[in-house]
Curated annotation (Swiss-Prot):
It is an enzyme of class 6 (ligase). One of its GO terms (cellular component) is cytosol. Homodimer. Residues 13-204 form the Glutamine amidotransferase type-1 domain. The gene is guaA. Its EC number is 6.3.5.2. GO terms for molecular function: ATP binding; GMP synthase activity. It catalyses: XMP + L-glutamine + ATP + H2O = GMP + L-glutamate + AMP + diphosphate + 2 H(+). It comes from Prochlorococcus marinus subsp. pastoris (strain CCMP1986 / NIES-2087 / MED4). ATP binds at S232, G233, G234, V235, D236, S237, S238. Keywords: ATP-binding, Glutamine amidotransferase, GMP biosynthesis, Ligase, Nucleotide-binding, Purine biosynthesis. Pathway: Purine metabolism; GMP biosynthesis; GMP from XMP (L-Gln route): step 1/1. The keyword Oxidoreductase does not apply. It comes from the Bacteria. This is GMP synthase [glutamine-hydrolyzing].
Length: 528
């Protein structure tokens, strides 16, 4: 009997051709916020491949290059003759203009970066319901001098003659500003105008439709085979566990490797939650002593990560062999992971990796290449915010859905320098106080991450009538949308005072608390 072909996955309604923009991922997210499915693909994607996908609209992203430079990234110019609506953003607009016979040069007046009010010159489908003089986000050093035949100017700014252009007959549009950036006041209006009014997309990309399409597909893919999932307790692996449990039930086995670097009470919470409350089979692997022994005397942060990664691999291999055999490995790969695997490694039709490889455990290191698993990656086309919505629809509680991101190596990289039981206990208690007070203040869901860091130095203090010499704790709280950039959170002084007082009074070997007010960039969120 011939093997059944897997049901074809849905094609994107909007295809985003990436020219190296830092915002390409953000464009896709904004379109999905409008309940329209979008994918990012390489600018090398051919017209034939685009025709096979048959999107309702195409967006050409921005990029760091200038279109008149040698070796500037291009796309197949035949896309402009497909009759598919196209929106060029910044570099994408300039490329469209140049390819169709217009002229792009370095900005005559001056480059334009940051907020700029746009002046609307005429009515257009693209700028419908966008207020005149509204603020948009600019980031360009080139300008359009002459438009191709058939185009008109529909908007300008003080320094940019062509802030938005239109060729209504050919359904080609361009904006010099970035509508996807939150600083653009009516940016989402522009995106919706293109997606709905111009490209005629339907708002049919929802959590419900994702589940309706994905659960039968998982059942069909797995059949009666066994699936192994390395459970970390984060939102990605937890959502995946619930999704797979709903699809295949007892054919799923979760493996939770406790390496001893988790936050206070988390291993116990996870086992109680998954195994006992929701009856999802979890194999608990206590490898605490094994991991900490390997880190004895190690101070270099990269070496710590590598050691934890290697040991994770060894434990995973040993336990999967003991519990197996398994035919499938489930991974919480998300769409940003797929995008980062980049360009020629992506199938332009599906946005999936062509050469399937096992994803690196978050911040820890990859699993062995010779593990003979087939992959189950049902979240690979979702962004983090979409995963949270799926988790909520599947019944995951807020304790997991809204949990702050936590690095794979855990507290081992929040202890600067060498790691010991004493330092782990100290940091674990301090970190719990930080999160406890942030929650009591009603700030937890407004902050991307809030945690404690233990420094490898000691400071002088006075407690009672005695001189102390103990560790300082760093309080790190940041606000962010995606972790790519972050700003330090403005925590009320009263909350900071409570955190500091509790830590120095309740945590042994700590006599000082300092507050990190560094943004990313230049700093990173984690200290190691």
């Amino acid at each position: 009997m011939s093997k059944k072909l897997l049901k074809k996955e849905r094609d994107p309604s909007i295809l985003i051709l990436d020219f190296g923009s830092q915002y390409s991922e953000l464009i896709a997210r904004r379109i999905r916020e409008a309940d329209v499915f979008s994918l990012v693909v390489s600018n090398f994607t051919s017209v034939k491949e685009i025709q096979d996908i048959n999107p309702k609209g195409i967006i050409l992203s921005g990029g760091p290059s200038s279109v008149y430079e040698d070796n500037a990234p291009k796309c197949d110019a035949k896309i402009f003759d497909l009759g598919i609506p196209i929106l060029g953003i910044c570099y994408g607009m300039q490329l469209m203009v140049k390819e169709l016979g217009g002229e792009v040069t370095p900005a005559i007046n001056k480059a334009e970066y940051g907020r700029a009010p746009i002046n609307i010159d005429c009515e257009s489908d693209l700028l419908s319901n966008v207020q005149d003089k509204s603020i948009m986000w600019m980031s360009h050093g080139d300008s359009i001098n002459n438009l191709p035949e058939g185009f008109i100017k529909i908007s300008h700014t003080e320094n940019t003659l062509h802030a938005a252009i239109s060729n209504k007959q050919k359904k080609l549009f361009g904006v010099q500003f970035h509508p996807e950036v939150i600083h653009s006041e009516f940016g989402m209006t522009v995106i919706k105008n293109f997606v709905y009014s111009i490209a005629k997309c339907k708002a049919d990309w929802t959590t419900e439709t994702f589940l309706e399409e994905t659960i039968p597909r998982i059942k069909q893919q797995v059949g009666d085979k066994r699936v192994l999932l390395a459970l970390s307790g984060g939102v990605d692996s937890s959502t995946l566990a619930f999704l797979l449990n709903k699809a295949i039930g007892k054919k799923l086995t979760c493996m939770f490797i406790d390496q001893g670097f988790m936050r206070k009470g988390e291993p116990e919470f996870l086992m109680e939650f998954f195994d006992k409350k929701f009856h999802i089979k979890v194999e608990y692997i206590n490898a605490r002593e094994r991991f900490i022994d390997k880190l004895n005397g190690i101070t270099d942060p990269e070496e710590k990560r590598k050691i934890i990664g290697r040991e994770f691999i060894r434990v995973f291999e040993e336990e999967s062999n003991r519990l197996g055999p398994f035919q499938y490995l489930a991974q919480g790969t998300l769409y940003p992971d797929v995008i980062e695997s980049a360009g020629t490694n992506l199938d332009p039709k599906t946005g999936e990796r062509i050469a399937v490889k096992i994803k690196s455990h978050h911040n820890v290191g990859g699993l062995p290449k010779d593990l003979q698993f087939k992959l189950v990656e049902p979240l690979r086309k979702l962004f983090k915010d979409e995963v949270r919505k799926v988790g909520g629809a599947l019944g995951l509680p807020d304790e997991i859905i809204k949990r702050h991101p936590f690095p794979g190596p855990g507290l081992a990289i929040r202890i600067l320098g060498d790691v010991s039981h004493e330092k782990l206990n100290c940091l674990r208690d301090a970190d719990w106080i930080v999160r406890d007070e942030i929650k009591k203040a009603g700030l937890y869901n407004d902050i991307w991450q809030a945690f404690a860091v233990l420094l490898p130095v000691k400071t002088v203090g006075v407690m009672g009538d005695k001189r102390t010499y103990a560790w300082p704790i760093v309080l790190r709280c940041v606000s962010s949308e995606d972790g790519m950039t972050a700003d330090w959170s403005r925590i009320p002084y009263e909350t900071l005072e409570r955190i500091s007082n509790r830590i120095v009074n309740e945590v042994e070997q700590v006599n000082r608390v300092v507050f990190d007010i560094t943004s990313k960039p230049p700093g990173t969120i984690e200290w190691e």
